[in-house]
Amino acid sequence: AIIMDGNGRWAARRGLPRSSGHKAGVDALRRAVKAAADFGIEYLTIYSFSSENWSRPAAEVSFLLDLLRRFIRQDVAELHRSGVKITVVGSRADLEPGIVSLLDDAERLTRDNAKLNLIVAFNYGSRQEIARAVSAIAKKIESGELSAADVSSDVISCNLDTAGIPDPDLLIRTGGEQRISNFLLWQCAYTEFV
């Protein structure tokens, strides 16, 4: 798994606008996805847009959303031809319909691919994901579908956004910081950090 971090700091060190750092981050992502596929890695999860990113300046958020749109429009067909399956995790509630449609289309186009599973964490926050899982489990208990005594770590895992996706073996944070930033808190219980 990769926390895509440090784009703004990278740009600032070079006297460039933050937007240049974000563009360079997308280029690095392309290289990482290709390398993962070339090395036979089956799953790669990227933290592309945190649910906390909405608090950034509006112009930066708008630029990041435009980058996402461009990436999907320009890269998804090539990823599909390369056998990459795209799965998006995170909340789609309150996203503009155009973004939701692009995410849905990318998943639909690539759903039968199996060379590399690219999991894109977009509008993702792990605490919110865990809260959604707890809410789903509570509803199952309330409806009688599940008893409280049956709740286990496996039941929780099966109700997360990442249900069915293996926990990461390795977590890389590209910006050099040493924090997890509300990313895959449950899933990283036994993950190595770099």
Model-derived regions: residue spans:
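Flexible, compositionally biased loop and terminal segments
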Residues: 1-194
